[in-house]
Amino acid sequence: MREIVHLQTGQCRNQIGAKFWEVVSDEHGIEPDGLYKGNNDLQLERISVYYNEVGANKYVPRAVLVDLEPGTMDSVRSGPLGSLFRPDNFVFGQSGGGNNWAKGHYTEGAELVDAVLDVVRKEAEGTDCLQGFQITHSLGGGTGAGMGTLLISKIREEYPDRMMCTYSVVPSPKVSDTVVEPYNATLSVHQLVENSDETFCIDNEALYDICFRTLKLTTPTYGDLNHLISIVMSGITTCLRFPGQLNSDLRKLAVNMVPFPRLHFFMPGVCPLTARGSQQYRAVTVPELTQQMFDAKNMMAASDPRHGRYLTVAAVFRGKVSMKEVEEQMQNVQNKNSAYFVEWIPNNVLTAQCDIPPRGCKMAVTFLGNSTAIQELFKRVNDQFAAMFKRKAFLHWYTQEGMDEMEFTEAESNMQDLVAEYQQYQDATADEEEGEYEEEPAEEEQ
């Protein structure tokens, strides 16, 4: 089967990762002690994508948990799923990344990276046909951003032909826990542009908005935010884990979603949105789902898709839905809002379907959009970066770990290039491109 090895680096990611395993284990009927207690054969049919079977009916996640300090690991271990993970797969340092990208990427993280790669190798060797890796990390911290990107580039070296998929939590202005987030995020994006195949940008600010507006939670906790992220993660991979009429995998997703190699930053969304622990109170229909799915309020990245155009879109429907109805509705959305889809990629909406709905729903959909509006998110980080970098504020923390100012300048210009590329394709039309191509051969003749 097409296995995926999951890595989680840094504090907040380990909490998200733990939540993700909670959701996936629940869907596959696996108890916190790793024993299968489900009642449906479909749960076991492709369980090997995320789990190793170690004994009769006992399953262990293919997860590697990494942090530069032992604190988070202890909380995962003592949490509800503590005994689910393989003890050898916890890799941690003692010093902490201190929210410093340079520590994670060059000094502390570099010392730990070989130990992590050994565990990753062991997991990869235990697979029949490895499909790729997924990494959860935040771009604002030291471990998740610095060490996360270091791991990505090392794994890339060793497994160049495997998919590399990242769930990256982008820092947001309203929900910030450190001053140097813009530095860490810019340095990380610089790495992700080169080394990742698909990056799902998740934004704390957007998640808070969803909790306030849609779920009507007055005081959302990180638990609520992590719950939303884990739903997206489980939604993206359902096609791999369960049978369906139109299956998709990470590579098919990338082929359909990435028109230009650098532009692989997606906005995820999910509907219907329900709070943790609450059931759905009414049935949803396919037209409602498609309507909600494209709603800006459902996006988990804080940029408004109406400010840009969609290059490509993928929608993964779950539950017993009629594919004919889905196709009609998707076509309908495209026809009505054709201005928001680039016309030079016809049929740029991919739909996949999986028969098994998430717990407590009849049907649901996970949305992925490759929209040029995501540049807003990078612009925002870049402006904050520029303001601090102009005065060289906080720079000594990075230079004393051996970094050079040059690296900051490079990362900044790479991010600005990325924004410019998105803008270029947002403005491009089918006609003007043709005109350009027609002129070129004429010049050669002279």
Swiss-Prot record:
PROSITE patterns assigned to the protein according to its UniProt record, in alphabetical order: TUBULIN, TUBULIN_B_AUTOREG
Cofactor needs: Mg(2+)
Biased composition (Acidic residues): 429-446
Region entry Disordered, spans: 423-446
Gene Ontology terms: cellular component: cytoplasm; microtubule
Superkingdom, natural source: Eukaryota
Residues holding Mg(2+): E69
Any GO BP: microtubule-based process
Assembly and binders: Dimer of alpha and beta chains. A typical microtubule is a hollow water-filled tube with an outer diameter of 25 nm and an inner diameter of 15 nM. Alpha-beta heterodimers associate head-to-tail to form protofilaments running lengthwise along the microtubule wall with the beta-tubulin subunit facing the microtubule plus end conferring a structural polarity. Microtubules usually have 13 protofilaments but different protofilament numbers can be found in some organisms and specialized cells.
Family, similarity comment: Belongs to the tubulin family.
Known function: Tubulin is the major constituent of microtubules, a cylinder consisting of laterally associated linear protofilaments composed of alpha- and beta-tubulin heterodimers. Microtubules grow by the addition of GTP-tubulin dimers to the microtubule end, where a stabilizing cap forms. Below the cap, tubulin dimers are in GDP-bound state, owing to GTPase activity of alpha-tubulin.
Descriptive protein name: Tubulin beta chain
Taxonomic classification: Eukaryota, Fungi, Dikarya, Basidiomycota, Agaricomycotina
